[in-house]
């Protein structure tokens, strides 16, 4: 089973990736892990990627695609793989088609965990932190037991990280939507796209994913 897992920030992609990895004998390949492994191993492509990252520059597609091909060529992907964070552009998606064809490991499905952006703003911008001890809360999913009082230290002062403020969250989602939409269209035209309702209980989301994978595996 060869998959791509997609979803906007806050959609629960990380949680579902862990469940898929625990349930199916496939390699979970995240972009970050892939780059770190290549750099740690000191491969030619890993060194090239490091030279760009150290300068604060984007790693060019030629290098990224090469690292992806090296990773997918490893034996732990023979039983299947799940890509997480790649591809990010149509050019990368087209390169991936060539890579998987060369390796005879074609994609079986692209699973997109779909949650309305307004719901994601609530999920992502609801986090706040105790100034005294650093305990983390969420206004909807994990509020303090007593409003305005930290459960851990009894403090009454809280703050919100800049990354968690609604305006920042909305901008991050906008950027991701603009990036993901062409990819979703690309894979829909290929007949590979499966959309899961991410606005429900974690177990129900995973049940939908399992049903898709069972149907694809037939």
From Swiss-Prot:
Residue numbers binding ATP: 10-15, 127, 136-137, 200
InterPro entries for this protein: Adenyl_kin_sub, Adenylat/UMP-CMP_kin, Adenylat_kinase_CS, Adenylate_kinase_lid-dom, P-loop_NTPase
Chief location bin: cytoplasm
GO cellular component terms listed in the entry, alphabetical order: cytoplasm
Superkingdom per UniProt: Bacteria
Cellular compartments annotated: Cytoplasm
Chain residues that bind AMP: 31, 36, 57-59, 85-88, 92, 161, 172
Keyword Kinase: yes
Residue ranges of the region described as LID: 126-164
Statement: the UniProt record of this protein carries the keyword Zinc: yes
Region entry NMP, spans: 30-59
Family according to the record: Belongs to the adenylate kinase family.
Domains: entry comment: Consists of three domains, a large central CORE domain and two small peripheral domains, NMPbind and LID, which undergo movements during catalysis. The LID domain closes over the site of phosphoryl transfer upon ATP binding. Assembling and dissambling the active center during each catalytic cycle provides an effective means to prevent ATP hydrolysis. Some bacteria have evolved a zinc-coordinating structure that stabilizes the LID domain.
Protein name from the UniProt record: Adenylate kinase
Protein source organism: Lacticaseibacillus casei (strain BL23) (Lactobacillus casei)
Taxonomic classification: Bacteria, Bacillati, Bacillota, Bacilli, Lactobacillales
